[in-house]
Amino acid sequence: SVRERVALLKVLPETEWSYVYDHVLQLTAGAETLIAACKQHGVKFMLVSGGFTYFTERLKSQLGLDYAYANELEITDGKLTGKLTGRMIDAQAKADLLRQHAQKLNIPLSHTLAMGDGANDIPMIQAAGFGVAFHAKPKTRSMADICINHGGLDAVYNCFAHK
């Protein structure tokens, strides 16, 4: 479980996370193109991840995302405690956040799109008006409206660009 994995990170210096963000993590090809195209059309963009806010908040700032949610690591004296704070972002939380933001923004769920790759994305994909499985596992692909198995995130935009 997420909590068990987080417990293994106990006493890891926060500086190690900075190294991972700067040198290890890479944006999926086409991410910047997709987000820029969405922004040109007034689309709100929300990142909901089972990962950690340390990374999603940086991505939100770097890419100009409207919203970002993830698991929040508890940090004391610059070190991880091995615990999470706040709500754990699991499959249900992802779907709930989609519904909450659609309601908050007065957008019918039928006008929302959710994209994911794993089983924990299925409730969100099913709650959305349109679900995209991106380089996804077979079970997730079976629950989506479309599947993108090759190429980058710009392929998502290309599905709608000429409609």
Annotate each PLM feature.
Residues K10, E14-K163:
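C-terminal cap/substrate-recognition subdomain and adjoining C-terminal extension
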Residues S1-R3:
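A phosphate-binding glycine/aspartate-rich beta-alpha loop in the early core of alpha/beta enzymes
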